Regions:
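Amphipathic, Lys/Arg-enriched alpha-helical "gate/interface" segment within cytosolic domains
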Residues: 1-121
C-alpha cells in the first residue's frame, strides 16, 4: 500500500505502508498526471520509508517500472528519507536511470528534504 499526497509546492509525498500493489501506481498516476498537465513538472518527490516494502506481485513491479519510465523526466528532485541502506543505494544507483537529482536524508528529516527540493537548503 502506498499513501501519497501532492502538496501546493508540487512536491509528491510517498509513504509506503506495505507491499506495493499495481493499483497503487494507477492511483498515483491519477494524482500526478493532472498536475503535470496543468502545472508542468513536479518540483520533487519525497519518499519517506523505513525500509523498501517490495511488491505484492510481478504485475505491481511492472506497474512501478512503467510509472517511473513514464514520469521520471517530469520530476526535478527526489529525496529519499530513511535510515535504511536503500537511501545510499538510491542516491548512487538510481541516478543512472532517472533524470531527477536524488539525495538521501536521514529518517525524520522530511522538512530538510522539502527545503532542498524548494532550493532553500
Amino acid at each position: 500500500m502506498l499513501e501519497h499526497n501532492l502538496d501546493s509546492h508540487g512536491i509528491l509525498h510517498l509513504h509506503p505502508k506495505g507491499a506495493l500493489a499495481k493499483e497503487d501506481f494507477a492511483s498515483l498516476a491519477k494524482t500526478v498526471d493532472p498536475y503535470i498537465e496543468k502545472q508542468g513538472d513536479l518540483a520533487g518527490i519525497i519518499l519517506d520509508v523505513a525500509k523498501f516494502p517490495g511488491w505484492d506481485s510481478l504485475g505491481a513491479m511492472a506497474a512501478h517500472i512503467r510509472f517511473v519510465r513514464d514520469h521520471h523526466k517530469r520530476v526535478k528532485k527526489i529525496a529519499v528519507v530513511t535510515d535504511a541502506k536503500l537511501g545510499d543505494v538510491a542516491e548512487k544507483i538510481a541516478s543512472h536511470f532517472v533524470a531527477a537529482t536524488i539525495k538521501h536524508f536521514p529518517a525524520g528529516q522530511t522538512q530538510a528534504a522539502e527545503q532542498w527540493i524548494l532550493g532553500k537548503g
